[in-house]
């Protein structure tokens, strides 16, 4: 994590969806917000079989891979709900893990905007690493994870 001006650049670490944390959602237990997010994706499309496989995933990477195999996937439908599903995953992550919530509520982060500085993801991130982000700000990707984190923190 690197704070520059009003931006909190992150990729990996405790803000990442791959960060290990215990989340209980319904009667199910998840090992990361990525696993919960992919589970919610599978359920959205009625793919219970893949949802069950995601539940058994040992790593966030495995859950993400399974999430790409969801049957009946429809991009238009997913685009309408994916931010809501991400919000639920983040809410579970932070509300159920006091250590992470304490970090998120750090006053040093007040008034700042979260930016996922992933050079590989222009949807959930900006498509640039933190060292090249500012000089390319006009070309950033959507940063949906950063925006959702910023919104979630603002709701606390």
In which residue ranges do the predicted regions lie?
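Charged, low-complexity intrinsically disordered segments
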Residues: 1-156
């Amino acid at each position: 994590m690197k704070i520059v001006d009003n931006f909190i650049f992150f990729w990996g670490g405790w803000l990442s969806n791959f960060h290990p944390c215990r989340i209980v959602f319904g009667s199910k237990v998840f090992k990361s917000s990525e696993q919960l997010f992919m589970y919610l994706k599978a359920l959205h499309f009625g793919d219970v079989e893949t949802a069950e496989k995601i539940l058994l995933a040992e790593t966030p990477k495995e859950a993400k891979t399974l999430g790409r195999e969801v049957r009946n996937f429809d991009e238009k439908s997913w685009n309408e709900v994916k931010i809501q599903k991400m919000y639920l995953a983040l809410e579970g992550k932070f509300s159920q893990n006091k250590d992470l919530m304490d970090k998120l509520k750090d006053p040093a982060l007040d008034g700042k905007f979260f930016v996922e500085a992933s050079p590989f993801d222009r949807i959930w991130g900006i498509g640039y690493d933190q060292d090249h982000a500012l000089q390319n700000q006009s070309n950033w990707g959507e940063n949906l994870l950063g925006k959702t984190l910023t919104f979630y923190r603002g709701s606390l």
